[in-house]
Amino acid sequence: MQNLVKEFIEKVLETNIVLEKPKDVSLGHYATPVAFSLAKELKKSPMLIAQELVTKLENPSLFEKIEAVNGFINFKLSPLFLQSLVDDALSNKENFAKQHKKSEKILLEYVSANPTGPLHIGHARGAIFGDSLARVGKYLGYDITTEYYINDAGSQMDLLGLSVNLAARDFIYGEDVSYPEVYYRGDYLIDIANQIIQDYGKDYLYDEKNFKDIALLGKDFVMNLIIKDLKDLGIEFDNFVSEKSLYSSWNETKRVLEENGSLYDKDDKTYLKSTQYGDDSDRVVVRDNGIPTYLAGDIIYHKNKYDRNFDRYINIWGADHHGYITRVKAAIEFLGNDSSKLEVLLSQMVQLLKGGEPYKMSKRKGNVILMSEITEEIGSDALRFIFLTKKSDTHLEFDIDTLKNQDSSNPIFYINYAHARINQVFVKAGVNFDDIKDISFEKLNQDGLNLVYESLLLESILVEAFAKRDMQKITEYLYNLASSIHKFYNEHKIIGSDEQNLYLKVLSIAALSIKVGLKLLGIEAKEIM
């Protein structure tokens, strides 16, 4: 809708314009300050230019009213233009608010949690954000590949093997053991141990020479758990990339960095000259024992990413990785690549409440709130929606009891109720699409036109949400649209009125916006409640 209006104005005026949406729809559906940008060139006041352009831009099939106000030009869309957009949408629902394929290829990496334990509630935020961002981007025509980086190299894997051994000795064999603070905790370790005993026998767990293999078996067990938990939230990845599988290319990567003069040795360690690109200090990439650091693994991975020739790379990291961005970008530059193609989005902490009090963590679950636990308690739809009600880089606090309420305090219930309400009106009225498809908006009242206009904003909301990497734009829009639907329903008699089918056509486009918007957030709109 916005693109059609913008293209018409630019064609008539033969110049690029900015098109804005006034906060008060009574002023118009769109406005442009183009007269201000033309004032210097035309040597006239913006007010005079705006008045002259109004006549030039008149188009009754597109605009019901064009008005110059203080140098701005306000446009009110015609009912018949809105009707044509609704007719197109309702006859081609699967493509509503969708855009054509774009040439830009994007690699989107998110979650990438260590395969040492199940996902917790903090991981869930990045997972839901990343999945929704991918869904919206793909719908808008971008070629997006989603990827999970498995951190299966380094000391955390050795620690996993030791933790499985200790958990087995404690809970299965009843030994008196003490847990070092750095060891992993949780019932999943016992599950791993039981699986190993079943497959290899109990003696296998006691033999120290098997600890590395135990760690690998544990990693596979945990990754299967992670994949299942993600799938329960409707999240699947195109690629899984193992850190360990990339380490064979470290020597080649190191050689390139050395040739670029980006490494130096000090105190038996090898450093990356990351301060040359704004880092606080140069970073160790090889320890004094000759083992590459965690940063070295990330350097290899990002080289691998760039070697695959995407146009843009998006990483979603936990907020605690903020300081890590500069050093990774420095390495990208040293490898001869363009670090501006890498965009790092941060996912902030989550504070979970229950009944107004902090949610209690279970020691048996490792003193974390498991993602699977909350998904089971409130459902994937509620969890997905609430996690997208705030921008990902801001703190999020919510009470899970609120998400069980059957009223407007529960946003996903409120939105779903609006959609189900419309569906049930059609059922009660005994009306189908053929009964309303030819209905004209010529006599539609202002309330109806406003609801139609709001419903048709979905595409521009999606474009803005993806461009700003802010899914909150969509959740806000859907909640406000649901509010408008409820208001319209409460203020206008529908079934049995003279305007019944006209109003049903209005509600049809509103329901379609709700359905498509929720789908792009990974949520299925309810038909009945």
UniProtKB/Swiss-Prot annotation:
Q: Which GO terms describe its molecular function?
A: arginine-tRNA ligase activity; ATP binding
Q: Which compartments does it reside in?
A: Cytoplasm
Q: Provide one Gene Ontology cellular component.
A: cytoplasm
Q: Tell me the InterPro entries matching this sequence.
A: aa-tRNA-synth_I_CS, Arg-tRNA-ligase, Arg-tRNA-synth_N, Arg-tRNA-synth_N_sf, ArgRS_core, DALR_anticod-bd, Rossmann-like_a/b/a_fold, tRNAsynth_Ia_anticodon-bd
In chain numbering, where does the motif 'HIGH' region fall? 113-123
Q: Which family does it belong to?
A: Belongs to the class-I aminoacyl-tRNA synthetase family.
User: What protein is this chain from?
Assistant: Arginine--tRNA ligase
Task: State the species of origin.
Answer: Aliarcobacter butzleri (strain RM4018)
